[in-house]
């Protein structure tokens, strides 16, 4: 099922801008996901970056990846002085601007506004020409606001914040905070308006209808003070907002005990006021952007589903019309815990599934604890596709996360280089163990600490540096580690002490020992949880360096040839560049892209049961995980049957 994304964001900066990579990484975590915490909630908005690295020519920003495209140009002194960047912006970038493409710029230099008169007509964010990282909170506010209005599903040109608060606290604590927030919105020039009942209700108008109508259309901040849950109008306001699927957050500021917490204030983001309203407003805007984006994304799924753009609760279920209560329900990632879902299903009479988009795509998938190998490394050309390290980490960990959720296991081979994928996958295995405990509830095995979700093959001589502390960490994270033997060039003494010889001999020994590891991975048998050992279910390739660090050929290419020799089902995700892209181009017989020494094959020889031409095209070229992952999951499920 092809899913058109509602929005993609593209960051453009000069290669000499020192904070460019950091800004991109922060934006990726802010708008998409934090790949180091894959089971946490994210907004799912893909973020790409574009720069002039390696003096490659600047290419047009791809606007066919999503329904709308937001382009953010970081204009620093280096870009201001660059003739190439100026010509690119004027002759290429600005000509792409249309209703579905919005361009904004950030002034990082005092003369940035002079960079291009044509660009000057676009919106500029300015923060006193100082480091963007020093003004990150204010930048978040402005970016969130722009993205919400760009998506604009409610037809609003200005966001209005409804400040829901109690006036009955001791010393009017909640009311004073509400007034302080109102004044902040007025004085800081946030371009956000507020609904504050003392000032916003027109004289002579119906009090109740004005409040409820405003709650219908605004985004809401709840000032949760000690008397909030006991005030009738506070309850009316929040129920009205939730009934109409409005974004709501809570700000906790309690001075004393609470007799009762109103139960239907749950399942919303919350924070604590710490004498600064900027983080509070940013949490509300992030929540609003997330719900806006999710409404558009979920609308791409079949119409015979109930869809909510937030984590569902009992009040949400009560608002579903009777005629729709037999429909399955779709809500955003990440999945709710087992116990929470059980409560919701019981309320609904256990009639329907309540699931996330990825669970919907894999709802009938069961890999029967078969093992799937992943081959991945960074590539030299990933920047040419706008792909940063955060995106590569993200797509890989999302793929593995859903394989684990579909009752599969992971196999990976590495050399424990600093910042390598081995340790990231180890951390994922640990987090999945925690998630599985919540997700399965009473179905959790009697001895969950004995479960293993991943097998890590570590080549000689790299495993010689692993101490007992590291081994304990792998065990704690439910990872089996397999220390591979060295190649036949290595003597028994050298196998214990480490690689010896000339530089050329050392490289050759490492290269051949990596080959031994790859052959071990491919030929080993893996437990499927039924006391029966089976071969790998399949292997997935992503990225990969195009030049080997040790041997005569890139590691990804060698692993591909070994898998091909064993007739292993293979998935090539070519959209992320690297050696995987080169293999895809070789199969497609792209002129000038042939790989010397690699035999010519057809896609059907990958044995992955993906036969539809459109799906082959997606796997070969797409970076959209909502397209890629369901195709891979369905194919793996067919192979596992």
What are these regions (language model features)?
Residues 1-33, 57, 78-81, 107-186, ...:
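C-terminal interaction surface of TIR/SEFIR-family domains
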Residues 175-199, 206-292:
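Polyanion-binding and phosphate-handling cores
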Residues 29-41, 52-63, 68-72, 76-86, ...:
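Acidic/glycine-enriched connector segments
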